[in-house]
Structure formats: C-alpha cells, structure tokens
Amino acid sequence: MAIERTLSIIKPDAVAKNVIGQIYSRFENAGLKIVASRMVHLSRADAEKFYAVHAARPFFKDLVDFMISGPVVVQALEGENAILKHRDLMGATDPKKAEKGTIRADFADSIDANAVHGSDAAETAAVEIAFFFPQVNVYSR
C-alpha cells in the first residue's frame, strides 16, 4: 500500500451547515491524517485559477460563483491510498446517487452544492496541494 496525499475542500454549503468536525471525524476514522488545514474565502481569481481545467465547461461560472459564496476549509490528507479512500468517503458527485453513509449522501443538497471536493489522481493532488499550501506548511505526522 502506498502512502499518498490528497487535497480535500469542504465547500461553502457544508461549512455553513457547521459539519466541519463531522467530516474531519470521517477522515480520521478512515485512517487519513490531516497534515495541513486552513479556512479561506476564495477570491474569484483564485477560484477561477484553481478550477481552470473546467473553464470551457458550461458549469464553470456557476462552480466559481458557488465556491466564492462563503468560506471553505481546505486540507491536505495523508494515508495509505489516500486519494481513493477520500473519494470513497465523499461518494458520488450527485448526492442523490451517493451511497448512504458517504459525506455527500449525508451532507450535500445538490450536484452543485455537494459538500466536498477531492483530488482525482496523484498528479492532480500534488498540484492542488501546492496551490493552497507551500510545501513548508505540510507536516507529516
């Protein structure tokens, strides 16, 4: 098993519902360590840069508008197979299709307000973690 890091974002809808602690408990109960964390209210420029891969997609403007609608909590998670483990915890993008007991099934309202973001691959995770955390601010433990 490989020790990996992945980026996780608790989105504005979940922050507003005050379920940050419940989501963190799920990470830790699954064996993921939080190795960096911060709350931030993204600027439009930062949200557009972070989601630039989706710039040509029809949902891009709505995604950016949503991500700047309130603060988010960003964390780097570390553990065995962290990327897949985190994606399994999140559940399907559409909370109506997410398995019971996943973060999105339990806390998300819609495909847009779907509570969490997670890296989809090791390469993406490295870029996304670097976007929010200079390497000096990520601490293995």
From Swiss-Prot:
GO MF terms held by the record: ATP binding; metal ion binding; nucleoside diphosphate kinase activity
Name of this protein: Nucleoside diphosphate kinase
Locations listed in the record: Cytoplasm
Catalytic site positions: 117 (pros-phosphohistidine intermediate)
GO biological process: CTP biosynthetic process; GTP biosynthetic process; UTP biosynthetic process
Record has Secreted as a keyword: no
Reaction catalyzed: a 2'-deoxyribonucleoside 5'-diphosphate + ATP = a 2'-deoxyribonucleoside 5'-triphosphate + ADP; a ribonucleoside 5'-diphosphate + ATP = a ribonucleoside 5'-triphosphate + ADP
Keyword Ligase: no
Gene that encodes the chain: ndk
This enzyme's EC code(s): 2.7.4.6
Pfam families named among the record's database cross-references: NDK
Stated family: Belongs to the NDK family.
Annotated source species: Paraburkholderia phytofirmans (strain DSM 17436 / LMG 22146 / PsJN) (Burkholderia phytofirmans)
Cofactor: Mg(2+)
Record keywords, A-Z: ATP-binding, Cytoplasm, Kinase, Magnesium, Metal-binding, Nucleotide metabolism, Nucleotide-binding, Phosphoprotein, Transferase
InterPro entries hit by this protein: NDK-like_dom (IPR034907), NDK-like_dom_sf (IPR036850), Nucleoside_diP_kinase (IPR001564)
Tree of life domain: Bacteria
Function as written in the Swiss-Prot or TrEMBL entry: Major role in the synthesis of nucleoside triphosphates other than ATP. The ATP gamma phosphate is transferred to the NDP beta phosphate via a ping-pong mechanism, using a phosphorylated active-site intermediate.
GO cellular component assignments: cytoplasm
Major location category of this protein: cytoplasm
Subunit structure of this chain's protein: Homotetramer.
CDD domains cross-referenced by the UniProt entry: NDPk_I
Residues holding ATP: 11, 59, 87, 93, 104, 114
